[in-house]
Amino acid sequence: MLAQATYGYDHQSKTALTDLIGMLLGSVSLQDVQMHTPCVNPPLKATVKRLISEVICRYGVPETIESDRGPHFNGEENNLTVDTNFFLLGFQLSHQLNIFLFCLLLVVYCGTICGNLLIIVLVSTSKSLHTPMYFFLTQLSISDILLPTDIIPNTLYILLNNGASITFICCMNQFYFFAASEEFECFLLTVMSYDRYVAICNPLHYNYIMTSDHCIRMAAMCWVLGFSITLMYCVTISLLTFCGPNIIDHFFCDLVPLIELACSSTLTIELEAYITCFLVLVIPIIIVIISYINIIVTILRFQSNVSRQKAFSTCSSHLIVVSIFYITLLSVYLYPKGGKSLKVNKLLSLLYTVFTPLMNPIIYSLRNSDIKKSLQEFIKKCVICQNGINNL
C-alpha cells in the first residue's frame, strides 16, 4: 500500500520519503535480526521492513541511503539483497512451552533413530526378512533417519534461543535434504504399493517380477528422482533476489516461506512447484489408490477367512503409513492458506517431518508378526552373546 501511495511522487515527496526510510532503517536494523537481539515487536518490524522493501524494489534506493547501506546489502541499481542470512522465528512460544517442546522433540528424535536403526538391523541380519517388501522398508527407514536429522537438531537450537539466524547456504542445504527425503518417500511408497499389488493380485509371477536386481533399480530410481528434482528447486531459488526482511516464520527452511520473501519474480519456481506437485504427489497417489482398489477387490474374492486376514495384515501397515503421510502432506501444501493459521501450519509440518518418521517403525513392528519374530530371535542372540562374553 505504501508503494502504491507514493507512485508518481515529485522531488519534494521523494526527499520526504528518503528521510522516512532513513529513520526506519535506523530504528529497524537488520543487525537486530542477524545478531540474535530480541525484537520488541517482531511482527511490527517485519511489516515495516516489508514496506521499505516494496518501496526500494519499485523506486530504487534513494541517494542519501545508497551511501549508508553498509555491509549487509549488495546488488546494483534497483536490487536490494540481504547478504546471506535468514532468521527462523520458530514457534514463538513461552519459555516453559519451549522447554517442554525441546524435551519432547529430543525424546522423539532419539526414538526415531533407534526405531529405524532397529528395522535396518533386523532386516539385514534375519534371513526370513530378505524379501522385496522388507528391502523397501529398510529404504523407508533410511529416509526416516535422514529427514528428522535434517530438521530436529536445528529446531532444538531455535527452541533454546527463541529463534536463530541461518545462512543462505545452510538454509538451502536444509531445504534440499528435506525436500529430497519427502519426494523420495512419495516415490518409495508408490513402489511399495506396487509390490503389494503384485504379491496379492499376481502371486504366481511375484518372484519373477520382483527380483533383487529389479528392487534395487526401483529403489535407486526413487533416490535419484528425489534428489534431482529438488536440485532444480535449489538452483531456481538461488537465482531469486531477496530484498528483506529475511524473516522466516517457520522452524525450518521450506519452499513457501522462502519464495514469499523474494522481491523478484517467482513465476518460474511457482510453475516448477505445480509441475512437481503433479509428478510427485498426484500421480503417485493415483497409482496407490488404483493398486489398493485392485488389492481389496482381489482379497474379497478369497474364500478362506484366514487367507483374507493374512492378506489384509500384510497390507494394512503400509496403508496406514501411506494415509498418514499423504494426509499431513496435502493438508500443509494444498489446503487453502486462509483456512488455517501459521500455528496450525507449523503443527502439521511438525507431524510429517518429526512424528511420522517415529510412527513408521512402530506401525510396521506392532502389526507385523515376521518382524516380531525376528526381534525375539535378535534379542536371544544378543543375550547368548552377552552370556558368552561374561563366561570368558
Range-by-range predicted roles:
Residues M1-E77:
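Retroviral integrase
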Residues E76-L392:
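Transmembrane helical core of 7TM receptor-like proteins
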